[in-house]
């Protein structure tokens, strides 16, 4: 069948997707599309994503540089990698160097505030700065793990080894927060390179970190400049172009649910494995025999701030709801008061009687909503007949991310673990779901099971887990043959 170059789009032009469906080109898309641009058709949804030529070329150049740097890293010593992480951390810790980064961040924050954008994670606070430095120090002092024996099988006259090896270029699309640098550059420890796009709110800060800290640290360690590439672009099209580049070894997306799902679909249809950190919100199921003091601690410590592992839905088993709902509400109010805030409660019909007069009534579909609060903690309450119903609701409505069962017997806890469809399961507070907190390693992202279970890996993606496996044969007896 003949093929050609896409040069123009017409309003109303039908575009097939998904094998048996079509979508139409809008007048706006047709007017914007010119020769040299690219059209990405998302096969899951029919979304038509316009990638202007300039964005494609910018991304293509960055990935080309990163791929060349990846091959160059094979000749780089582990000490050089340690020197890079140490130099990066030292520059962030140097007040004179950091002053330029701080000024850029202040400008980003002012711009975001003027546009009524959230700045909760945009401000490069002293704590965020310290956490970035600490994360880089972890990578600085981590043993080299680019070539590690995983297994060995001996035969007469020969043996084979499986060995961990670097994967390639890792593409990131991050939300607008500065601390992602420490996460993204962690892949260099295992011999990989990185290309990333950061949310436009934090782009000025990202440019400053690159020029004041990353680039000098790469140069001082004699590492290729392409080992860490920032895509200097504000358009979402840069992210689409990056994830549609089949030369990536892995695509990692962090941000809002829809945008992350769309990016993941783009990556997968181009043959790129994807790790998606999208919709979050943890669930807590409260058994009738739950200890009130333990329950109060679990709730309070799960609502200290809004991140992906914050308590979002609380399921109370009916037999204990009247006794334990006040404990949940009081603990939630306590967490809110520590922030100078108030607790916002959403109640499914079954929970209206125990949720308090100020509760906001919601349909059952609200169980699938992650409350993206900034200041006032928000939770949804639902009353269920038993733990089995709570599991059923979680598996139907949640993003299948994190769940805890408070109380219950050992049999209840095991059944909960066996039947709940989540990568993270516990019996206490939900905020433990974090790579640094749980595994002492800076994380690149956390994945839910909303799009299915993950092949051969856990829900925490760290720099140490980005690798492939090679097999090497050693022949002693060269008479060996098949």
Regions found by a protein language model. Name each.
Residues 134, 138-217, 221, 260, ...:
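Conserved small-residue-rich beta-alpha loop and adjacent elements
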Residues 2-51, 57-67, 400, 408-482:
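C-terminal segments
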Residues 319-420, 424-442, 453, 457:
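NAD(P)-dependent aldehyde/semialdehyde dehydrogenase
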Residues 1-161:
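N-terminal Rossmann-like NAD(P)+-binding subdomain of aldehyde/semialdehyde dehydrogenases
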Residues 113, 125, 155, 159-160, ...:
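A structured beta-alpha segment of the ubiquitous adenosine-cofactor-binding alpha/beta core
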Residues 96, 175-176, 183-193, 209-220, ...:
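ALDH superfamily catalytic-core signature
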Residues 77-83, 100, 221-228, 305, ...:
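Flexible, glycine/charged-enriched surface loops at secondary-structure junctions
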